[in-house]
């Protein structure tokens, strides 16, 4: 089995389009079958595969309706509705990262502006952190952000969170802005679909409870009907 970002035609084994990969109508199952000598190869959208895994054996097990939001290079979305993966009639459903949250906003990798992915992916967080470091240098402000780079000396998705834990206020500003956009998107998803569980996966979810403690209060503040109906359980993905 293969899990890939993008619009996936799982019936015909093709990657129809992936904005962060050079694939358009790529017959990945056929190509891999030829290379590996296997006939029974299946491809699915990576977030859909993650959603199904969580529904079967992870944070959403025992439920019939759940959603996963994956935070990595982009923002992915996987839906399990009535115990079935939902991908739309054209396999393009669930592309949560490309819902617009800011009209005319930041440029997204898909070529459009204002997509949620441009604000809530790990890539977006890295960009925001780099911008903050540059601003601090230009204005002579002290910051611990540069003490929290990865082993290669680059900003990562952990940099701002690690510096915030050291008490750095500039890092806290970055994290708070990032979390605001993330919570806005999650609240909108919950208001539309009202799943039993919404789990957060991908690289940024490695922050675990620290991330959830920041996101959940903002989500609850914007959730429609809190206190009047059962609430969607918000959690970190387990798998």
Whereabouts are the PLM-identified features?
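ATP-binding/phosphotransfer module of carbohydrate and carboxylate kinases, centering on a glycine-rich
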Residues: 1, 9-12, 30-40, 53-64, ...
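Conserved A3 ("GATE") glycine/threonine-rich loop of ANL adenylate-forming enzymes
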Residues: 49, 73-76, 103
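Short beta-strand segments
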Residues: 1-5, 44, 68-74, 78-80
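Short glycine-enriched, charge-decorated loop/helix-capping segments at active-site entrances
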Residues: 15-21
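A glycine-rich, Thr/Ser-enriched phosphate-binding loop motif common to dinucleotide/cofactor-binding enzymes
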Residues: 43-53
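Generic structural signal for well-ordered beta-strand positions
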Residues: 16, 86-87
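Structural signature of FAD isoalloxazine-binding scaffolds in flavoprotein oxidoreductases
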Residues: 92-95
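Short catalytic helix/loop segments, enriched in acidic residues and glycine
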Residues: 24-25
């Amino acid at each position: 089995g293969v899990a890939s970002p993008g619009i996936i035609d799982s019936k015909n084994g093709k990657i129809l389009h992936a904005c962060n990969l050079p694939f358009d109508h790529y017959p990945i199952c056929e190509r891999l079958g030829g290379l590996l000598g296997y006939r029974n190869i299946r491809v699915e959208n990576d977030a859909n595969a993650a959603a199904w895994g969580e529904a079967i054996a992870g944070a959403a097990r025992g439920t019939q309706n759940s959603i996963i939001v994956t935070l990595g290079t982009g923002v992915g979305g996987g839906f399990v509705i009535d115990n079935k993966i939902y991908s739309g009639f054209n396999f393009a459903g669930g592309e949560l990262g490309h819902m617009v949250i800011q009209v005319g906003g930041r440029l997204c990798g898909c070529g459009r502006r204002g997509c949620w992915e441009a604000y809530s992916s790990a890539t977006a967080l890295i960009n925001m952190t780099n911008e903050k470091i540059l601003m601090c240098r230009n204005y002579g402000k002290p910051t611990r952000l540069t003490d929290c780079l990865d082993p290669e000396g680059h900003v990562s998705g952990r940099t701002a969170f690690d510096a915030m834990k050291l008490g750095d206020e500039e890092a806290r500003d970055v994290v708070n802005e990032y979390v605001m956009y993330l919570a806005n998107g999650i609240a909108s998803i919950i208001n539309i679909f009202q799943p039993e569980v919404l789990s957060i996966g991908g690289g940024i979810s490695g922050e675990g409870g620290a991330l959830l403690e920041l996101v959940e209060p903002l989500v609850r503040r914007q959730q429609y009907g809190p206190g009047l109906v059962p609430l969607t359980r918000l959690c970190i993905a387990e798998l």
